[in-house]
Curated annotation (Swiss-Prot):
GO terms for biological process: selenocysteine biosynthetic process; seryl-tRNA aminoacylation. One of its GO terms (molecular function) is ATP binding. The gene is serS. This is Serine--tRNA ligase. It comes from Laribacter hongkongensis (strain HLHK9). ATP binds at residues 262-264, 349-352. Its EC number is 6.1.1.11. One of its GO terms (cellular component) is cytoplasm. Consists of two distinct domains, a catalytic core and a N-terminal extension that is involved in tRNA binding.
Amino acid sequence: MLDIQLLRTQLDTVAARLAARGYTLDTEAFTALENERKALQTRTQDLQARRNSLSKQVGEAKRRGEDASAVLAEVSGLGDELKANEAALEGLQGRLAELLQAIPNLPHESVPVGRDETGNVEIRRVGVPRSFDFQVKDHVDIGTPLGLDAETGAKLSGARFTVLRGQMARLHRALAQFMLNTHADEHGYTEVYTPYMVNATSMYGTGQLPKFEEDLFRVPRGDENFYLVPTAEVPVTNFVRDEIVKAADLPLRYVAHTPCFRSEAGAYGRDTRGMIRQHQFDKVELVQVVRPEESLNALETLTGHAETILKKLGLPYRVIVLCTGDMGFGSQKTYDIEVWLPAQDTYREISSCSSMGDFQARRMQARFKDEAGKNQLVHTLNGSGLAVGRTLVAVLENYQNADGSVTVPEVLRPYMGGLEKLLPQG
């Protein structure tokens, strides 16, 4: 959430920066609400001052033994008006809060301006796509004889669910363990295990609610709604909600492996085949909580940590910086990492790494105490390190062999009991 003081003092500038990301700020509505708020506050302050003055007059009249009934009647009337004004002011504050909650984050000045994904800018490519001397298959055709079972997934749960059996399930587990170990042992992240359901307050804190409720799976329980996590970013970032962190404890680095649940409400007809877009998928998530002046450097570092996984796996990839029109709601700056998929002859997203600035921290009231003893908002970052299912897809396609087997990348073999190849079953 943006600082309302920024809108009050730099409304036109904020509107222009938001326009660069395709969001039209209703400046007239905001100005009207602000003018109404100011008028109400001024009137309320005047009434309070008048009531205080009259109360003194009542006290003086009583000390002199004079009749104060007329003044008391006026005080009573002022009290009624004050209550009405306070109720109106509370309603106005609620409307201002609703307006603020719908406003996306301001893009950092280093973000390229663009209307949509066509405005994204490639930063670097790493690795050379393999040349095959046979007809490449996609991950479904490769994976089905190896234990990828979309049919049973559909029987159990419907479209966009998959069952993995035997060596495929083991490869999936190996990837997650490899990612966790790399980030915890080499990059200094603290591994955490979190709930897979969170309350609405947590979803609000990281920006999923109220704007993106249709993308979530809601679990009603009595009078309260819980939500299946769309990413471990939600529970992990909320660790610092309503907390004041010691400056000496920053930066905080957490890594978590969770299933993620998304309705894919806006993805009808896209990636319906295979594991690219699922309602349930696993992801290893990286979260950092840092001082404000460190957030952009931390984004470069976090992105590099995600890239390390692809480098160790020997998978070709590229990094792009998202333009203003393609950024996520709460993002200040985002790098997408895209892995090469031979069957699609293109790069596909496997990680998104973002600095959120103080956008989430303001919603969560997540602060740290600086050296001067002043409480300041922290900055938060998150990124996939990596999406496990899509990494499995990339391994299958990039390491496939003509006989239908798949070579296991060397770094995964210790997690696979030394297995060097996945072989078709039956």
